[in-house]
Regions:
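Nucleic-acid endo/exonuclease domains
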Residues: 1-125
Length: 125
């Protein structure tokens, strides 16, 4: 990951941690915060800020609201994903409505992704 990032992103990440969406808040406080493998929220990764990041699993979780599906949203998301993937990170996009409508399924999916990634690296969860 290139170390050159916009210093304003650090302050912005702090703001985003303080002002999480209701879906981010739910996923963080009801699942990821206590998850046995550490996740960070609103993590600066190069020139981007990831919603949730698990270094051990090399996994980025992005929660996508409606703005991600209109205008330039899909193109920006594709650029972000390509940027992060070139550093060996897996980027997974989860729609906000999946968090509110199928929370258990979302948690099971994330759990599966983390376990697959960590065990493929040769260490138990």
């Amino acid at each position: 990951m290139d170390r050159k990032h916009n210093p304003a992103n650090t302050a912005r990440a702090r703001e985003l941690r303080r002002d999480m969406t209701k879906e981010e808040r739910k996923l963080w406080y009801e699942f990821l915060r206590q998850y046995p493998v550490r996740f960070a929220r609103q993590k600066v990764l190069g020139r981007y800020i990831a919603d949730f990041y698990c270094a051990r699993a090399k996994l980025v979780i992005e929660l996508d609201g409606s703005q991600h599906y209109i205008d330039t949203g899909p193109d920006k998301d594709r650029q972000r994903t390509e940027y992060l993937e070139q550093y060996g990170l897996r980027v997974v996009r989860i729609p906000n409505n999946a968090v509110t409508g199928n929370f258990t399924g979302v948690c099971e999916y994330i759990d599966l992704l983390v376990k697959e990634a960590v065990t493929s690296q040769g260490s138990p969860v």
